[in-house]
Regions:
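Long, charged N-terminal interaction/targeting segments
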Residues: 1-82
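Cys/His-clustered metal-coordination modules, chiefly Zn-binding fingers
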Residues: 79-130
Length: 130
């Protein structure tokens, strides 16, 4: 008898994102961390209509647990999405950069002094930029 392959368990957020575009408003979810292994921040915004600016924007942080594995943060994100009646969810499939914000946490145009991993690295591919 052939063994059944077990599918990797997906989070409710991953399931929503896999459904694809279902109209506006769209919730966008992006993960950030000091490297490409641990997400210490997640930012979720609502894009109300095509061409509109993302508003509102909410951020969650964790110093001790990867935010992708934190069930409390996951539930709060789902509640945020429901509250703003998002029909679609778009989520990056990886950590896309440093959790610190340019012009807020460090000067514009400079590299974050706390997250050297992301210095000179393309945040979408993870490749080092020469």
């Amino acid at each position: 008898m052939a063994k059944k392959l077990r599918r990797r368990s997906r989070s409710p957020l991953e399931k929503k994102a896999r459904r694809g575009f279902r109209g506006y408003p769209v919730a966008t979810i992006a993960f950030y961390g000091p490297n490409d292994e641990i997400a210490s921040k997640v930012a979720v915004s609502i894009v109300p209509a095509e061409g509109a600016e993302a508003d509102p924007l909410e951020r969650w942080f964790s110093d001790d647990l990867d935010v992708r594995r934190d069930s409390t943060i996951g539930e709060e994100i789902l509640a945020f999405i429901r509250r703003h009646e998002a029909k679609s969810v778009v989520m990056a499939d990886r950590i896309i950069g440093c959790p610190h914000e340019e012009k807020i946490d460090y000067p514009e145009g400079e590299v974050c002094p706390e997250c050297r991993f992301w210095a000179h690295r393309d945040r979408w591919s993870g490749d080092i930029i020469h």
